[in-house]
Amino acid sequence: MVRLVLIIFFVYTIILSIGSINCIDNNNLVTNQAALFVFGDSLFDAGNNNYINTVSSFRSNIWPYGQTNFKFPTGRLSDGPEKAWLPSIPPNLQPNNGNNQFTYGVSFASAGAGALAESFLGMVINLGTQLNNFKDVEKSLRSELGDAETKRVFSRAVYLFHIGANDYFYPFSANSSTFKSNSKEKFVDFVIGNITFVIEEVYKMGGRKFGFLNVGPYECSPNSLIRDRTKIGSCFKPVAELIDMHNKKFPDVLRRLQRQLSGFRYALHDYHTSLSERINSPSKYGFKEGKKACCGSGPLRGINTCGNRIGPSQGYGLCENVTDYLFYDSSHLTEKAHRQIAELIWNGPPNVTRPYNLKALFELRLT
């Protein structure tokens, strides 16, 4: 099972940056704020899995998650902080979410989620269900704000996506009928097709500005590096092949959508390259460990036992200095790593985030 890096520092670093391009009233609230709506997996799960009936390995509302800044577990899969002065972007399923919060955005993401409904079925909120939840938010906003204001909110908002990696790991963790009955290329096409459908649906609802990360090098996460116990430290090649296909095909889809959909604009961050560079050359980016996790057990702490999530009998180790590490647990990054990646997504040059970066998307005013 793979569970991808979370949005904690991504979104809140991004929110901090947004502050420079918005006005603030006397109550310190943004009065001209473009919303951020977030879809995806554990890269962006702000705690939705706390509110569904799932297994502990898909949650992180346990110690030591949150130890560095929150001082308590929040359900977010990193030890990163929340430092923004703006209203925080809540998980969609958090009780008592008010419509006023939704005007700033909301995260629909779910740790372990995929674009395919069969990926970890019954344990996560898949991308199609996340879309349905977004449609429910639309209804609430239309009721509260009216059609015209809701249309304005949606047209100015940015829609951020990271999804797909769980679909590519799932066939190697469980029985996938879709994977078994199709070629690898066709399977990747199914994943991308489901993502494309959701993008087009959000566009029909008024969305125009989209941010994407391609699929990261999770074939080389600590968890993946120990999958073949005869080759500890080797990346998991079966998944690498699928991820490579995805990352080659997906940019073509986005270019096609930009040609076909009037006003469609996007930012695509090359997350695979950004994270690969840090895994392979950690010292260049200020890390001592690029392949061993801070929290977990077994070789490279690659067994996902952080916080005794699979039972106290297993136990786990915890590093002394988390800033030395790229990975916090077997699949998720540390705050320091999040900060670096977030800056590349927000304000990165065209060789890493293109054709727009996220800052440019927020500043963009479409007529």
UniProtKB/Swiss-Prot annotation:
Instruction: Spell out the InterPro entries in the cross-references.
Output: GDSL (IPR001087), GLIP1-5/GLL25 (IPR044552), Lipase_GDSL_AS (IPR008265), SGNH_hydro_sf (IPR036514), SGNH_plant_lipase-like (IPR035669)
Q: Which UniProt keywords apply?
A: Glycoprotein, Hydrolase, Lipid degradation, Lipid metabolism, Secreted, Signal
Coiled-coil segments on the chain, per record = none
Record flagged with keyword Disulfide bond = no
Q: Name one GO biological process term.
A: lipid catabolic process
Q: Name one GO cellular component term.
A: extracellular region
Q: Which positions make up the signal peptide?
A: 1-23
- Glycosylated residues, per the record, are 175, 194, 321, 351
Question: Its Gene Ontology molecular function terms?
Answer: lipase activity
Which named protein is this? GDSL esterase/lipase 3
- Catalytic site residues? 42, 329, 332
Chief location: secreted
Supply the EC number(s): 3.1.1.-
What organism does the record attribute this protein to? Answer: Arabidopsis thaliana
Annotated family? Belongs to the 'GDSL' lipolytic enzyme family.
**Could you tell me the superkingdom of the organism this chain comes from?**
Eukaryota
Check the record and name the CDD domains matching this protein.
Answer: SGNH_plant_lipase_like
